[in-house]
Amino acid sequence: MRAARMFVKKLARKKLVPHRVKAELFGSLGHTGKGHGSDVAVLVGFEGELPDQIDTDTIPSRLEEIRNSQTINLNKKHKIKFLESDLVFHRKKTLPGHANGMKFSAFDAEGNLIKENIYYSVGGGFVIGENTEQKPIAEMHLELPFDFQTGEQLLEMARSSGKCISSMMLENEKTWRSEQEVVNGLDDIWSTMSACINKGIRTEGVLKGG
């Protein structure tokens, strides 16, 4: 969802309004995409949504509208053509940067390619563009205050530092963002989880994928 939104925002910044867009998912995303809802995420991402802001109750009706009308509301501003064949799952192909790769393409009315970008989903909700780093993603590394590879190492760090595991994880998170941002993010996660639990208790029927 984030990657698709990044693509349409880039189109908007360049003042490009395509006649049609296409999404291709590679590697793990291509192999398990529909089962994990990646197709849904791409479609609503093209419509400008973010995972932490979208009203999930509206998704089924929006998907039905896209399929019935064969159009998508690009970035919530432009109705453009979108066919089911414009969402491609490459189950046996990968992109060079990472196992979870996506390629988004935009075309004009004559079918000419006007913009194309590659993105990688690198875990933890993070998405980077193809040119974010010059070196391969696998080589990217940040120095963490408590860098561990095993549970045994983590416990030894707790003993030697006198810190509990949650305190050490907070210090690691502060490598990327401020402590207040971490706390606010955790509050958002808990609110989402709590709402999901309450919705599950109230709702009847069969859970998708179950």
Question: What name fits each language-model region?
Answer:
Residues 1-4, 35-37:
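Conserved phosphate/anionic-ligand binding catalytic regions in large, soluble enzymes, centered on
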Residues 116-120, 162-169, 183, 194, ...:
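A structural signal for small-residue-enriched, beta-sheet-centric alpha/beta enzyme cores
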Residues 22-163:
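Beta-sandwich/jelly-roll carbohydrate-recognition scaffolds of carbohydrate-active enzymes
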Residues 2-25, 57:
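Non-transmembrane, aqueous-exposed alpha-helical and coiled segments at domain scale
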Residues 176-210:
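Accessory "access/gating" subregions that flank catalytic or transport cores
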Residues 1, 32, 179-182:
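Short, N-terminal intrinsically disordered low-complexity segments that are rich in Pro/Gly
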Residues 158, 171-176:
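Extended alpha-helical interaction modules
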